[in-house]
């Protein structure tokens, strides 16, 4: 379980328009996880550059307990200014749209590399041999692939114990999986379960 290191208030005095900001001295972000509390509900930062808690694909343990997904930070600042575009003319472009996990699960790789950005990268020579110049990736931002039913609070007039308990036969059905990823997500964070290395951002950029 996670231990709460501290709680930082963001009062109205720190508000500029619809944005509230605070500066915290002396924090080292290397191993820091954080969330927001908005109107009593704990939620991850929608602009987080990294999400912790979904490193394993289709891990149903996230549905079996009150699993907490948190915002996190990259070890090093993401360098984007040095990146350059191939600038392939549109009339010469051959585009291939793929799903990172689906495309690379049967790539001949074994173990943890299957279904990752690294496995896709190793298939680039094959794609080039086909004449492909450009890849369009299906969602690679962080999203919850398991369709976890929302927990509803029981009204007072329903007796305790009248509904099936957690883990009963009626609740052991396989949860549905949003394989493609077209859903609400953390659009600034690469999907952790698609990463082979610890630094999934750098792996995707590479």
Explain the meaning of each model-derived region.
Residues 8-10, 141-143, 193:
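Active-site-proximal loop/turn and secondary-structure-junction residues that shape catalytic pockets
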Residues 122-141:
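Catalytic domains of carbohydrate-active enzymes, especially glycoside hydrolases
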Residues 16, 112-127:
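Short secondary-structure subsegments characteristic of cysteine-rich extracellular domains
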Residues 19-97, 102-115:
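The feature marks proteins involved in alpha-glucan
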Residues 109-116, 147-206:
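Aromatic- and acidic-residue-enriched carbohydrate-binding clefts of CAZyme catalytic domains
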Residues 87-92, 128-129, 180:
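Extracellular/periplasmic catalytic domains that process cell-envelope and extracellular macromolecules
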Residues 1-21:
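Surface-exposed amphipathic alpha-helical tracts and adjacent flexible/coil segments at the periphery
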Residues 4, 36, 98, 127, ...:
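Conserved, mostly hydrophobic/aromatic
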């Amino acid at each position: 379980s996670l231990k709460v290191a501290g709680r930082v208030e963001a009062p109205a005095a720190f508000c500029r328009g619809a944005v509230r900001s605070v500066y915290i001295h002396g924090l080292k972000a290397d191993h820091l996880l954080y969330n927001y509390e908005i109107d009593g509900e704990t939620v991850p930062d929608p602009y987080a550059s990294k999400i912790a808690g979904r490193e394993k694909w289709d891990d149903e343990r996230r549905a079996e307990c009150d699993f907490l997904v948190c915002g996190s930070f990259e070890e090093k600042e993401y360098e984007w200014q040095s990146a350059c575009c191939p600038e392939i003319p549109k009339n010469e472009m051959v585009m291939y749209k793929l799903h990172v996990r689906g495309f690379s699960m049967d790539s001949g790789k074994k173990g943890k590399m299957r279904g990752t950005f690294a496995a896709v990268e190793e298939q680039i020579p094959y794609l080039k041999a086909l004449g492909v110049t450009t890849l369009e990736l299906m969602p690679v931002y962080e999203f919850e692939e398991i369709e976890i039913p929302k927990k509803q609070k029981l009204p007072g007039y329903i007796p305790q114990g009248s509904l099936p308990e957690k883990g009963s036969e009626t609740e052991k059905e396989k949860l549905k999986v949003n394989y493609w990823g077209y859903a609400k997500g953390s659009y600034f964070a690469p999907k952790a379960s698609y990463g082979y290395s610890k630094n999934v951002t750098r792996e995707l950029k590479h």
